[in-house]
Amino acid sequence: MSRTLVLVRHGQSEWNLKNLFTGWRDPGLTEQGHAEAKAAGQRLKAAGLKFDIAYTSALSRAQVTCQHILDELGQPGLETIRDQALNERDYGDLSGLNKDDARAKWGEEQVHIWRRSYDVPPPGGESLKDTGARVWPYYLHTIQPHVLREETVLVAAHGNSLRTLIMALDGLTPEQILKQELNTGVPIIYRLNADSTVASKEILSA
């Protein structure tokens, strides 16, 4: 038995490809995104993993990624919990804008602050700190108990919602987590100790 948590950022979305701020908007996956999600499932299968339960956000790009992974593992009907607590960071007024257009409107420095500061939200949106304030409690109260019961748990979500989990699990500072990029469709496997600390971490790159 193992206490295993697998985090996967969704495959490339249509708006990732167009360089748009996405947040809580709900574009689908590109062909590449579908392929990335299926490949993630294949790598997890090769690693010998099977899941006891899956969690994903309320957004289709994460849900479809989750389903592709489960299909590849031969677990298409696995219990899957969908919750907006795992949604991407809400970019507020930036949502739907091309990143270059946002820089033209507000200035490169201001947009950089909104994107890469820990606690400064864009207008009408969330900071990374705000995102963590909903993601981490949800993890502690809902997801972690399954892991500590020696289950294997999948979380298919988003770059910033997963970044806040990684920050807490790895004990990183805001400065450290802001420098980390999460590639689309790449599984991160955590094995936890009985006291919920991290025993090991493995990134299943292609």
UniProtKB/Swiss-Prot annotation:
Catalytic activity: (2R)-2-phosphoglycerate = (2R)-3-phosphoglycerate
Residue(s) at site: Transition state stabilizer: H158
Active site positions: H10 (tele-phosphohistidine intermediate), E88 (proton donor/acceptor)
Entry EC number(s): 5.4.2.11
Pathway annotation: Carbohydrate degradation; glycolysis; pyruvate from D-glyceraldehyde 3-phosphate: step 3/5
Residues binding substrate: 9-16, 22-23, 61, 88-91, 99, 115-116, 159-160
Molecular function in Gene Ontology: phosphoglycerate mutase activity
Matching InterPro entries: His_Pase_superF_clade-1, His_PPase_superfam, PG/BPGM_mutase_AS, Phosphogly_mut1
Keywords: Gluconeogenesis, Glycolysis, Isomerase
Residue ranges the record marks as coiled coil: none
Entry's Gene Ontology BP terms: gluconeogenesis; glycolytic process
Similarity comment: family membership: Belongs to the phosphoglycerate mutase family. BPG-dependent PGAM subfamily.
Name of the molecule in the record: 2,3-bisphosphoglycerate-dependent phosphoglycerate mutase
